[in-house]
Amino acid sequence: MPLVTTEKILLDAQKNKYAIGAFNVENMEMVMAVVAAAEELKSPVILQTTPSTVKYASLDYFYANAKVAAQKASVPVAIHLDHGNSFELAMQALRVGYTSIMIDGSHESFEDNIKVTKAVVDACAPSKVSVEAELGKVGGKEDDLDGGDGGYTDPLEAKEFVEKTGVGSLAVAIGTAHGVYKGEPKLDLDRLSEIKEVVSIPLVLHGTSGVPDDTVSECVRRGICKVNYATDLRIAFSKGVKEYLAQNPDAIDPKKYCSVGREEVKKYVMSKMHVVGSVNKA
């Protein structure tokens, strides 16, 4: 089927109290793995690319990969720009054909975050492309993204932000972090519930790799509708490739070792689709 926007699938997730996994992809094999997992479990899915991934292979390459994967799939697939760090990059993604765009103004002042988010929302509206924003700051470091120590989302600011921007979904900072955790993260679940009380749009959880599955499931019960995974996909792919090459040190065919990495990613994605509750929701 054609690529879908995230609005429709996230609203269904919100209505039916589950979440959709959004998986950061770095190459063709990861795109194939994520969509294969979604097909097998009859789950809607979101493919994501970060600015650093876009630098590696450009927006149009990843869009083309996602478009072909979606056309071959029998489940809804969206292609999302994760952590778009400028209005210009967001517009490039819009022109290429991305069906969902995040504009990340979380390191700007509250007023400037509203301003840039509103500009992207207004620009995307004629194409009915979904827009995600972030309020508060998810900590940690991943790719070219450095969230520092992070800063929690204030529920009343979240309400004002959504009202003034008209954004379609909101990433909230409740204690998660990008990259690899040094210890078990401690999430402020009560804060999440407070945000959910005053914000009507779907909420997004970033920095989920390494968060215990039962904690993620509790976040979904408290209103999270989109759950982002990135670091653990890289680990899974690299694990498969490394193990194959360790057993076959003379291997020179990328198809052979990359296919093992692809299978590791597929297994990981399937496990997380069960966690977020999206199985059989396509």
Give residue ranges: language-model regions.
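Alpha/beta enzyme core
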Residues: 4-12, 27-52, 60-76, 84-198, ...
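Active-site-adjacent C-terminal substructures of enzyme catalytic domains
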Residues: 186, 191, 198-201, 254-262
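Cofactor-binding active-site loop characterized by glycine-rich and histidine/acidic residues
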Residues: 56
